[in-house]
């Protein structure tokens, strides 16, 4: 996982450019379970985590929520029976920022700790 999971998010503001595609593809190598998808022209990191039941899925979603609050960087979470889909992107840059890769790595770490 490299060092991404040990990195803290940094504040970013409107008007900053998103990461270049080449940079994103390089960083993606550190979080190989994630994919980059585009929705409405905005790139996002996406991964679906699977669980034995709804209770485990909800507990994981809650843990991701706590992580998001601690970093003030919030994902889209979709929780269903036995799975949680997590999407990270940065609204301020209308795409991917280093923070999204950091949070994806830290989300992976939460999952591994279960």
UniProtKB/Swiss-Prot annotation:
It catalyses: (4aS,6R)-4a-hydroxy-L-erythro-5,6,7,8-tetrahydrobiopterin = (6R)-L-erythro-6,7-dihydrobiopterin + H2O. It is an enzyme of class 4 (lyase). Keywords: Lyase. The keyword tRNA processing does not apply. It comes from the Bacteria. Its EC number is 4.2.1.96. One of its GO terms (biological process) is tetrahydrobiopterin biosynthetic process. Pfam families: Pterin_4a. Disulfide bonds: none annotated. One of its GO terms (molecular function) is 4-alpha-hydroxytetrahydrobiopterin dehydratase activity. Signal peptide: none annotated. The keyword Lyase applies. SUPFAM superfamilies: PCD-like. HAMAP family: Pterin_4_alpha. Belongs to the pterin-4-alpha-carbinolamine dehydratase family. NCBIfam families: PRK00823.1-1. This is Putative pterin-4-alpha-carbinolamine dehydratase. It comes from Chlorobium luteolum (strain DSM 273 / BCRC 81028 / 2530) (Pelodictyon luteolum). The lineage of its organism: Bacteria, Pseudomonadati, Chlorobiota, Chlorobiia, Chlorobiales.
């Amino acid at each position: 996982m490299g060092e991404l999971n040990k990195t803290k998010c940094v504040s970013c503001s409107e008007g900053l450019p998103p990461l270049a595609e080449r940079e994103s593809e390089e960083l993606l190598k550190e979080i190989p379970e994630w994919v980059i998808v585009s929705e409405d022209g905005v790139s996002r990191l996406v991964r679906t985590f699977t669980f034995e039941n709804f209770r485990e899925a909800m507990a994981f979603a809650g843990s991701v929520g706590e992580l998001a609050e601690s970093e003030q960087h919030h994902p889209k979470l979709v929780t269903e029976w036995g799975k949680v889909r997590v999407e990270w992107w940065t609204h301020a840059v209308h795409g991917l920022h280093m923070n999204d890769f950091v949070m994806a790595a830290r989300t992976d770490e939460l999952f591994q700790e279960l």
